[in-house]
Amino acid sequence: MPEGILQVYPPPTREVDSPYADIELPSTGSHDSSLPYVIINMVTSVDGRVTEAGKASGLGSALDRRTMRTLRSKADAVMIGAGTLRAERLSLALDDSGLPQPLAVIVTETGEVPLESNLASYGRQTVLVIGPNQAAEQLRGRASVLALQTSPSGAMDLREALRSLKATYGVNGLLVEGGPRLNHSLISQNLADELFLTISPKLLGGLPGEALTMLEGNLLPAETRPAPDLLSVYLAGSELFLRYSLF
């Protein structure tokens, strides 16, 4: 058992093998049974930054990365925004554990999705690209495609996309791993059920635009923004693992 991993809330304090190993996700959204249950998992510095030199991969510890894989094993699909994929090479798969691989879902507005170069798990898990009609069609033949109609302002209907994920692709539990614009879109539209947040014991600083925060978008209206409800706290050294309900 790894030493020093403590569940400190809810009480009583106890030592655990790893955060979140025993959780099971509901099969439907909190307030809409036509939607999957959506969780967001992010790591931030103490001063709230989610990237360092444009990348998120160096923020969390080895335990944070293991925790990320634990959450992936609980979900039917893992979703990221295309900007996150463009920023660095990454994998959305599980380790070679023998478990079924989650569906990899990439959300794009432009169709600029470097699957072959930046998705390390490309070829060993099914990939679905979601985007406006023209942008998504650019990816046909390289991945499965879910093409969406857009509003006059160009916004995609993420609620309809989530409904399609559940109805067509059998996604009951969806894990979202950023980036900040996708997080903001989901939270501002009340489409995210829970937030899993790792606080890395680092201070990064940075000017606006140099180091992103967890949510990038307009200020959330006070009357409709979620009021996160703390569900659990794990402590490993100086690293915190927080779980919140967003409903």
Regions found by a protein language model. Name each.
Residues 1-247:
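Enzymes that bind and transform nitrogen-containing heteroaromatic metabolites
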